A protein has these predicted regions:
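Arg/Lys-rich amphipathic alpha helix in sigma70-family domain 2
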Residues: 67, 81-102, 121
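A short pre-motif secondary-structure segment
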Residues: 142-146
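DNA-recognition helix of helix-turn-helix
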Residues: 84, 88, 139, 153-154, ...
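Short, charged helix-capping/linker segments at alpha-helix termini
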Residues: 17-27, 37-56, 70, 186
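Structural recognition of an alpha-helix C-terminal capping motif at a helix-to-coil junction
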Residues: 52-59, 73-85
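Amphipathic, Lys/Arg- and hydrophobic-enriched alpha-helical face
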Residues: 29-47, 63-64, 132, 177, ...
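Internal acidic/polar
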Residues: 2-10, 97-121
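N-terminal module of bacterial RNA polymerase sigma factors
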Residues: 1-35
Length: 186
């Protein structure tokens, strides 16, 4: 699991100051690029798509900085929300071009996981990623944010705009489906 780098109140304050915004945004980008890239990548799978969505995320974040009024925790949640929307927008565009549902796109992406993993990849990890891509979209989002990004339910609730209890139920169902799916591959 990865941990999300700390975003300090001093960094948030620097982002609000027009004279220091560019330098502060560079620091924010350096701190959050990797976790946001991997959050997006787990949703869209393809490296180039993840790069595009990540770039879009940071452009939208920079453009929206003047309107942002929260603190450090809210900034992290806001960035994840922008990243999630960028990934979902990309998946919807792909869906329109394929005339498929998001779940069908997920199944298509599961096939790509093995292709992109390469010959040296840990087979158990590849199977886990394939199984995660077969989850319904909401469960996939919650599982990725909780398991891979190691975010607390309170942060996930801010990112997805859902109640914590709802997220816990979605995570539980996701884990149960993954256990069943992975056990059938043994």
């Amino acid at each position: 699991m990865t941990t999300t780098p700390d975003i300090t109140p001093a960094l948030v304050e620097a982002l609000r100051d027009a004279a220091r915004r560019n330098e502060a945004f560079d620091r924010l980008t350096a701190a959050m690029l990797r976790p946001l890239y991997w959050h997006i990548r787990r949703l869209v799978v393809v490296h180039e798509d993840a790069q595009d969505a990540c770039q879009e995320c940071f452009v939208k974040a920079y453009d929206g900085l003047e309107a942002f009024r929260g603190g450090a925790d809210e900034l992290r949640a806001w960035l994840y929300r922008i990243a999630t929307r960028a990934a979902l927008t990309l998946l919807r565009r792909r869906r329109r071009s394929l005339f498929a549902s998001l779940d069908e796109v997920g199944r298509e992406l599961a096939v790509r996981v093995a292709d992109e993993a390469g010959p040296d990849a840990d087979r158990a990890l590849v199977r886990l990623h394939e199984a995660v891509l077969e989850l319904p979209l909401k469960q996939r989002l919650v599982f990725n944010l909780r398991y891979f990004d190691d975010l607390p339910y309170a942060a996930i609730a801010r990112i997805l705009g859902q109640r914590e209890q709802t997220l816990k139920v979605n995570y539980h169902y996701a884990v149960e489906k993954l256990k069943t799916k992975l056990a059938s591959h043994e």
